Amino acid sequence: MSLADHKVVFFDILVKSALPVTLQLIAGAFVGACLIGLIGGIIRGLKVPVLSQILGVYVQICRGVPDMLVLLFLYAVMTRGSTYSIAVLGISLIQGAYIMEIIKGGILSVDKGQWEAAKTLSLPIHTTLFRIVIPQVMLVALPALIGQLVLLIKGTSVASTIGCMEMTKRAMIAMSGFSNALVVYGYVLIIFFIMCHALTVLGKKLEKYVVERIIGDRYERE
């Protein structure tokens, strides 16, 4: 491949055309996954009858079924939906199940004394949740959520199976004009690595900050 071909593949096809779609897919899916995870995590953490069991089955399905099959199933069901919207929904459902377990674990880790104190003060359950419990959960769960975002970013490549024009699909199409698979997919690998590595570093710094500055300060005050 000539230098001009490298420019076309990297800048014109991947960076200018495919990367914006991929970033929109990441943003949409992460927001959707966080909403599913937060609502479901609260229900699971509070052990709401029936709903908690239903969500437990949903989590097990998402854990036990390959991501690609989830997207292909939604693609077959939502015949009038765009590939982008189906990809956002599918990835949101998949990642939301994992975030749900993170939030659930955070809620269950909150000291029972705080629940009892809130009950003694006759605080409504929604006040207890959103003023006392959820802020603590989000603080502790933030590094784990960053880690889940890294997995979500890597998982967006599965959207290529339903024709969503993210980076992997664009690279597959580019192969028809540029036969050097090592270069084309190598550029995709580099872009994904940069995004995931940057978030991994951020997650480690956040985890260190939470442990040293926030949790550490609380223990000192106690």
Predicted regions and their residues:
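Transmembrane alpha-helices and adjacent helix-loop boundaries
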Residues: M1-E222
